[in-house]
From Swiss-Prot:
Family: Belongs to the ClpX chaperone family. HslU subfamily.
GO molecular function: ATP binding; ATP hydrolysis activity; peptidase activity; proteasome-activating activity
Keyword Zinc: no
Description of how the protein assembles with itself and partners: A double ring-shaped homohexamer of HslV is capped on each side by a ring-shaped HslU homohexamer. The assembly of the HslU/HslV complex is dependent on binding of ATP.
Origin superkingdom: Bacteria
Reported function: ATPase subunit of a proteasome-like degradation complex; this subunit has chaperone activity. The binding of ATP and its subsequent hydrolysis by HslU are essential for unfolding of protein substrates subsequently hydrolyzed by HslV. HslU recognizes the N-terminal part of its protein substrates and unfolds these before they are guided to HslV for hydrolysis.
Single GO cellular component term: HslUV protease complex
Native organism: Buchnera aphidicola subsp. Baizongia pistaciae (strain Bp)
Name of this protein: ATP-dependent protease ATPase subunit HslU
Gene, per the UniProt record: hslU
Residues holding ATP: 18, 60-65, 256, 321, 393
NCBIfam families the record matches: hslU (TIGR00390), PRK05201.1 (NF003544)
Subcellular location: Cytoplasm
Key words of the record: ATP-binding, Chaperone, Cytoplasm, Nucleotide-binding
Amino acid sequence: MSEMTPREIVKELDRFIIGQKKAKRAVAIALRNRWRRMKLNKELRYEITPKNILMIGPTGVGKTEIARRLAKLAKAPFIKVEATKFTEIGYVGKEVDSIIRDLTDSAIKMIKSTAIKKNKKRAKELAEERILDVLVPTIKNNWKKTNTNNNSEATLQIFRKKLREGTLDDKEIEINVAVTPMGIEIMAPPGMEELTNQLQSLFQNLTGNKRNIKKLKIKDAMKLLIEEEAAKLINLEELKKEAIYAVEQHGIVFIDEIDKICRNHGSSGPDISREGVQRDLLPLIEGCTVSTKHGMVKTDHILFIASGAFQVSTPSDLIPELQGRLPIRVELQALTINDFELILTEPKASVTMQYQALLKTEKVKINFTKEGIRHIAEAAWKVNESMENIGARRLHTVLERLMEDISFHASDHRNEITITIDEKYVQKHLDKLISNEDLSRFIL
């Protein structure tokens, strides 16, 4: 779990996301409160439930990006889901309980990965011994044939040294390794996910103990054996307990596109993927127990962050019970020309930097002038204003069009060349297209 302060979290998010201070502060406080809660005594800790967040803002302003970056910062079980993928219980489609099952699976992977790294040193020693067991008997057979009386321990140490130095990396050996269980996909009706998981585990166990002899180079065999030995050192029961605890106490669920499950005022009849889904989400957000293949998971202290554009609906169109379970509301602002300008230059691995790095592989050096950047930002903003506002995603469309010729002809140059993207270059390639609204609708 992350021990970063709210200020440090916001600073880290600032490296990748421009603006949206309120949203960054809200998620930073929520993340820090997880850490604060764990410092309390057990009785009080149980009483403090997370304050779930609802992020409201137009498309392309950074809602999903905040979730992506938060996942890396949290160092806790995290899952991002689309609200539109779920249907009401009893209908064909994914049930909301699968969110917690997927979150638990991700926690298992995360903790298993940490355990493997922790055991890597010991696993490497065991893998080394297994490879030496294959190499040394061959030497012993040769000793018998030649009737020489060399010290076997000294020979073993020589081979150990060679193995560690990498001089034997390309030598081929035969090793006995476990067969990877074959994944079996089972289609099951809604509500039968638990049975499906049990059947999949059963089929995997049938092949799980099988072993196979493989002929591999020592460097490849070492990697395979380290993984196998590290997995053997893990206590699976302890791993499951740790994963369930991590999900229950530190788990974060990000529900995107929640505005798409608001009731459509113009329609009649059952709304199996709208209001029904909202009602199914209620117990999950409020706190219930979900059955997973790893054990029972309580959702009382899982943090839920929902987001939506709410262009054709408002948060008040959500059912009142769900509104009450998302008490913190954060409104994200539409992006301005200045924001676009900063997005093109400020973030780590910005879009312009990506193009420069890609074309550098073809010996094409791209220089963006301040005026050129400003004109690109203005072009993207104008297209957003005259048509659908898709936020920062418009920059990708505009830049792709601007860089099309350069990208196509980049491999034609034998020597290194430099191309400057200034205001004139941008005007030449974009202005006519932007002024022709019919064309820009299809191209930009």
